[in-house]
């Protein structure tokens, strides 16, 4: 493992996504926002299609990527320019931070080589959270950045905004202004995860009235530990559309793995701090203390973690409610805290010390992701007393965090059949004051190990439509093993699909733009445009070429599904062409009210074509 930097540099994927180029849109205050532009064939006569881009500099051919140096500190000048932070020595890194407790110190990895900066924190009496700024009426560069990002595609539509959907009471604007972003953050309906010690991150918003976001989970375990693979999975996941990444490492080298990821991540990074705290006490939940947990929070905040999953809603009186469940407590963090509560027969230190946790969060602008430690792990346990009791507590904790101007989102289930999904969204909105909801799926059935990315994407699309702000991906390995690089891509693309489907259903103003562009390309047999406009151009072209690999097939007016004689779109075009020869618009011809005349006209077409049922493909 000592050769980790070289291996990491070799494995990270860079370069543009097929058919795309990186562009930057500049705002009035000089904020430059990265986007992806998909060029279409000149024959289409259509302008390029711009899409939201999470991939950072890794897809920019003009960027110099050096994993050992990390990414440029995009936000550092913004952070320092506000004048409310100070640098300080920070806590010393200890062997137990990397799970190297005891005499055996073997198995470590090379630390990130460029950790020379001193961490930042709020000056005494200051609060550096985006919510605090928003509530003071300040529009930060982060808010302006978010507004420009969220408007991608809307300028192209101009006054033809496509508002066709049901948003269930959301307040999605036609055009996102920095003022709108500020107001949503101030109300707690959106968060901008942006730790002041993660200046490499590109600002993004998680909220019901913005585009639905997705999260990808990575991280090593006690069974499989490879820092190079985790850094590569982070870069790979954002290439395909992950808006945030959670490092759920539980084995050795947790601190160093996280440092490599953070310094090279252009998206917010989340963690579950109790995992590392548990490693520090040798995996014995009963030995956890507030002091160890607090030290872990500060350690991770100094590194730059943008949001913490904290299972403060697992209360002692709720634990007996899970006794009759089919699958009990399935959350790792939830089970750890449940065991601690039972061993000490008292409320957890996460719950009792919540105000003190808020003080740490606002000193670094770390957002809460209040964990659903009692989420259902099977559809049999969905929407039960334990789940909703915890949800009510999370709503109470949200109000406490908001008193500190700390950003909050709420984690949700889990395993929920389709007919019970909307109740989860409705109860969360009511209990948690419209704080952003962040759900794992939910999985809509329990019978598909190996296909749980599909069972969960069904639920994810639904709950995203109902109002969930961010969807946590599920890979094909869910319940079976640690996902590899290929699993990560499948999970991300599947969830990008679910999130986009939700945006369409909500009536997001620009969501249909890409769909319509691809549909026109499909009808006009512009194969390369079809590939490039898709969520996964590589796989789309690969599937096409499995049966029609010749270069000429990229211009053919048919595919291998129907062949040249049965292509419905080709036949439709022939009908339109025939209508044009009759000096009538195609829609008028096809929609003619006189059925008899229409049938006679089609009879004429048949005879003019030689009376053959099947026709050869046009040259």
Swiss-Prot record:
Transmembrane regions listed in the UniProt entry: none
UniProt keywords, alphabetically: 4Fe-4S, Iron, Iron-sulfur, Lyase, Metal-binding, S-adenosyl-L-methionine, Thiamine biosynthesis, Zinc
Listed Pfam families: ThiC-associated, ThiC_Rad_SAM
A GO CC term assigned to this protein in UniProt: cytosol
Residues that coordinate or bind Zn(2+): 415, 479
Positions of the UniProt region annotated as Disordered: 93-114
Enzyme class: lyase
Metabolic or biological pathway, per its Swiss-Prot or TrEMBL entry: Cofactor biosynthesis; thiamine diphosphate biosynthesis
Biased composition (Basic and acidic residues): 93-104
InterPro entries, A to Z: ThiC, ThiC-associated_dom, ThiC/Bza_core_dom, ThiC/BzaA/B
CC cofactor note: Binds 1 [4Fe-4S] cluster per subunit. The cluster is coordinated with 3 cysteines and an exchangeable S-adenosyl-L-methionine.
Swiss-Prot/TrEMBL cofactor(s): [4Fe-4S] cluster
Swiss-Prot/TrEMBL catalytic activity: 5-amino-1-(5-phospho-beta-D-ribosyl)imidazole + S-adenosyl-L-methionine = 4-amino-2-methyl-5-(phosphooxymethyl)pyrimidine + CO + 5'-deoxyadenosine + formate + L-methionine + 3 H(+)
Keyword Lyase recorded: yes
A GO term for molecular function: carbon-carbon lyase activity
Key word Metal-binding present: yes
GO biological process: thiamine biosynthetic process; thiamine diphosphate biosynthetic process
SUBUNIT field: Homodimer.
Protein function: Catalyzes the synthesis of the hydroxymethylpyrimidine phosphate (HMP-P) moiety of thiamine from aminoimidazole ribotide (AIR) in a radical S-adenosyl-L-methionine (SAM)-dependent reaction.
Protein family per UniProt: Belongs to the ThiC family.
NCBIfam families membership: PRK09284.1 (NF006763), PRK13352.1 (NF009895), thiC (TIGR00190)
Protein's UniProt name: Phosphomethylpyrimidine synthase
């Amino acid at each position: 493992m000592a050769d980790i930097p070289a291996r990491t540099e070799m494995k990270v994927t860079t370069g543009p996504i097929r058919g795309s180029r990186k562009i930057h849109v500049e705002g009035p205050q000089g904020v430059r926002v990265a986007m992806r532009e998909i060029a279409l064939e000149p024959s289409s006569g259509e302008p390029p299609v711009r899409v939201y881009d999470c991939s950072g500099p890794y897809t920019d051919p003009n960027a110099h990527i050096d994993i050992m140096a990390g990414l440029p500190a995009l936000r550092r000048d913004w952070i320092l320019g506000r004048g409310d932070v100070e640098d300080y020595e920070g806590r010393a890194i200890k062997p137990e931070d990397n799970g190297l407790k005891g005499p055996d110190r073997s198995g470590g990895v090379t630390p990130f080589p460029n950790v020379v900066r001193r961490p930042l924190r709020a000056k005494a009496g200051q609060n550096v959270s985006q919510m605090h700024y928003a509530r003071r009426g300040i529009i930060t560069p982060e808010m302006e950045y978010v507004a420009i990002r969220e408007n991608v595609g809307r300028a192209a539509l101009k006054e033809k905004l496509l508002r066709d959907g049901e948003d269930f009471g959301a307040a999605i604007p036609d055009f996102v202004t920095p003022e709108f972003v500020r107001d949503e953050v101030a109300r707690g309906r959106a968060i901008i995860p942006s730790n002041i010690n993660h200046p490499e991150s590109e600002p993004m918003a998680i909220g019901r009235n913005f585009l639905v976001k997705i999260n990808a989970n990575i991280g090593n375990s006690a069974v499989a530990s490879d820092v190079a693979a985790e850094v590569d999975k982070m870069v790979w996941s954002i290439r395909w559309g992950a808006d945030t990444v959670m490092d759920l490492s539980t084995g050795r080298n947790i601190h160093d793995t996280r440092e490599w990821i953070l310094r090279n991540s252009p998206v917010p990074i989340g963690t579950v701090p109790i995992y590392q705290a548990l490693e520090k006490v040798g995996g014995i939940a009963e030995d956890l203390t507030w002091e160890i947990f607090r030290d872990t929070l500060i350690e991770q905040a100094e590194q730059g973690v943008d949001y913490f999953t904290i299972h403060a809603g697992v209360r002692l009186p709720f634990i007996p409610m899970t006794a009759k469940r089919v699958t009990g407590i399935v959350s790792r963090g939830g089970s750890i805290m449940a065991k601690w509560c039972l061993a000490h027969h008292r409320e957890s230190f996460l719950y009792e010390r919540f105000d003190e946790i808020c003080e740490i969060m606002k000193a670094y602008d770390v957002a809460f992701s209040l964990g659903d430690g009692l989420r259902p792990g099977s559809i049999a346990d969905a929407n039960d007393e334990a789940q909703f009791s915890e949800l009510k507590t999370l709503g109470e904790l949200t109000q406490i965090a908001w008193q500190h101007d700390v950003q909050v989102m709420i984690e949700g289930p889990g395993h929920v059949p389709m007919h019970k999904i909307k109740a989860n969204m409705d109860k969360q909105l009511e209990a948690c004051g419209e704080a952003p909801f962040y759900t794992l799926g939910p999985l809509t059935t329990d019978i598909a190990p190996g296909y749980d990315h599909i069972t969960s994407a069904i639920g994810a699309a639904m709950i995203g439509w109902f109002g969930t702000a961010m969807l946590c991906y599920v890979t094909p390995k869910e319940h079976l093993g640690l996902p590899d690089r290929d699993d990560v891509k499948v999970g991300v693309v599947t969830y990008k699909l679910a999130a986009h489907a939700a945006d369409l259903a909500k009536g997001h103003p620009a969501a249909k733009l890409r769909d319509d562009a691809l549909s026109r390309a499909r009808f006009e047999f512009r194969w390369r445009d079809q590939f490039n406009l898709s969520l996964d151009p590589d796989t789309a072209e690969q599937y096409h070429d499995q049966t029609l690999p010749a270069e000429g097939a990229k211009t053919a007016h048919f595919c291998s599904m129907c062949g040249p004689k049965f292509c419905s779109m080709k036949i439709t075009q022939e009908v339109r062409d025939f209508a044009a020869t009759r000096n009538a618009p195609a829609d008028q011809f096809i929609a003619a009210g006189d059925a008899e005349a229409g049938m006679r006209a089609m009879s004429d077409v048949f005879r003019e074509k030689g009376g053959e049922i099947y026709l050869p493909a046009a040259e």
